[in-house]
From Swiss-Prot:
Co-factor binding comment: Binds 1 nickel ion per subunit.
MF terms (GO), sorted A to Z: glycerol-1-phosphate dehydrogenase (NAD+) activity; glycerol-1-phosphate dehydrogenase (NADP+) activity; metal ion binding
InterPro entries named in the record: G1P_dehydrogenase_bac, G1PDH, Glycerol_DH
Listed cofactors: Ni(2+)
Encoding gene (name): egsA
Binding locations of Ni(2+): D191, H271, H291
UniProt protein name: Glycerol-1-phosphate dehydrogenase [NAD(P)+]
Length: 404
């Protein structure tokens, strides 16, 4: 990572910007020797019985070799292969969680999540409910949620992020990561590019709604984003240096969330659009699209919407809309210039699309099978998925366009 785990803990103790949550992660390894160090970690923790959670693809990519290592270490293990749905998608929903809980022995010492975001979300929630720790083994640099506490789950068809627990350790084998599908690498880059708008929404929410804000968490996140942009060529090439930079950035972004105890820094309106599209795909029984691919598309859409719709409307307001709270109105007047500077600091939608396209990601909704009408609807409704987040999209829809 850009910062070592110990450095981040030290910086958090020095930071006075916010009350930080304890980082429960004891070890992070991103190297060729990750599985050997995982075995040593299990010996150190004296874990004798574990459940390996994976799906068919991730078990082939890393689970089988990991189980061989466990066998050599005389660690008893149960393999839980998450069943896919009729579209061959693995979904983090009630069915998957119930499968893990039913297949887990009562005397298990720890879970090991072998996979990408979805497998981790399922394992994170299941282990939390069983009051058992889990260890992260990422198989692709595809999301920034590996080290976070939040578990985005589909509950009765609705996307909800439930606070659960972070892994106690992360062991990412660079050989495995470099073999990840190009689409998953592009998705990881897309999840980092999304920080442009998530950080802007967070700053706006702090100004308008006094939501918690921490300069250290902001700095860790922007540092991770900049590292990815600076090494875009290597990430696009899929070489070891690029994959290492991307994985480090994703892990550090997740640790930043962990410090806050919330995902303010990493998830704004661009994520709400992504979740809205995901729910619609589930309703239509369509194959799912990688989370990072969706936010790679939604981020420039949000930038464009903020710069061409939100800002012009805000700058022309002469009196308080009936639907706007008096306090919000007063703060908007105070921070108008700051909001303008914030929006002007964002890369253009064209620049963001060029970056995502450079690493092989989709840049238009149609490339992901997302209908323009769905995009239009999500810009009006997606903020309702997180009504406790005062994003610019929320302000636009709930405070500025709700007259009458």
């Amino acid at each position: 990572m850009n910062q070592t785990l110990d450095n981040i803990v030290s910086l958090a103790k020095q930071c006075r910007g916010h009350h930080h949550y304890d980082i429960s992660i004891e070890q992070i390894v991103v190297s060729h020797e990750a599985f050997n160090q995982l075995a040593a970690y299990l010996r150190y923790k004296q874990y004798k019985k574990v459940v390996v959670v994976a799906d068919n693809r991730t078990f082939t990519a890393a689970g089988r070799s990991l189980c061989d290592k466990l066998k050599n270490e005389s660690v008893l293990y149960t393999v839980c292969l998450i069943q896919s749905d009729e579209n061959e998608d693995v979904i983090a929903d009630e069915r998957a969680i119930m499968q893990v809980l039913l297949e887990t022995p009562n005397d298990v010492d720890a879970f090991i999540a072998v996979g990408a975001g979805t497998v981790h979300d399922i394992t994170r929630f299941s282990s939390y409910k069983m009051k058992v720790p889990f260890i992260s083994v990422p198989t692709a640099p595809s999301v920034d949620g590996f080290t976070s506490m939040g578990a985005p789950l589909i509950i009765r068809g609705v996307k909800k992020t439930i606070q659960a627990q972070a892994p106690i350790a992360v062991f990412a084998d660079t050989d495995v990561l470099c073999q990840a599908p190009k689409a998953m690498i592009a998705a990881g880059f897309g999840d980092m590019v999304a920080k442009y708008t998530s950080l802007a929404d967070w700053q706006f929410a702090h100004w308008m709604a006094n939501e918690p804000y921490c300069p250290l968490v902001y700095q860790l996140t922007i540092q991770s984003l900049n590292a990815c942009v600076d090494h875009m060529e290597d990430i696009a090439a899929g070489n070891e240096k690029g994959i290492h930079v991307l994985m480090d950035a994703l892990l550090q972004s997740g640790i930043a969330m962990l410090l806050m105890g919330q995902s303010y820094s990493a998830s704004g309106a661009e994520h709400h659009l992504s979740h809205y599209w995901e729910m619609e795909f589930l309703r239509q029984n369509k194959r799912q699209v990688l989370h990072g691919a969706k936010v790679g598309v939604s981020t420039p859409i949000i930038v464009e919407h903020y710069q061409r719709v939100f800002w012009p409307l805000l700058s022309e307001l002469k009196q308080r809309p009936k639907s706007m709270d008096e306090t919000i109105w007063e703060r908007l007047k105070i921070y108008t210039d700051s909001i303008q500077e914030l929006l002007e600091s964002l890369p253009s939608p064209e620049r963001i699309r060029a970056m995502v396209e450079k690493v092989g990601g989709a840049v238009a909704p149609q490339q992901l099978g997302i209908d323009p009408l769905l995009v239009e609807r999500s810009l009006k409704e997606a903020h309702r998925l997180r009504l406790n987040r005062f994003t610019m999209l929320y302000c636009l829809n709930e405070c500025m366009l709700m007259e009458g």
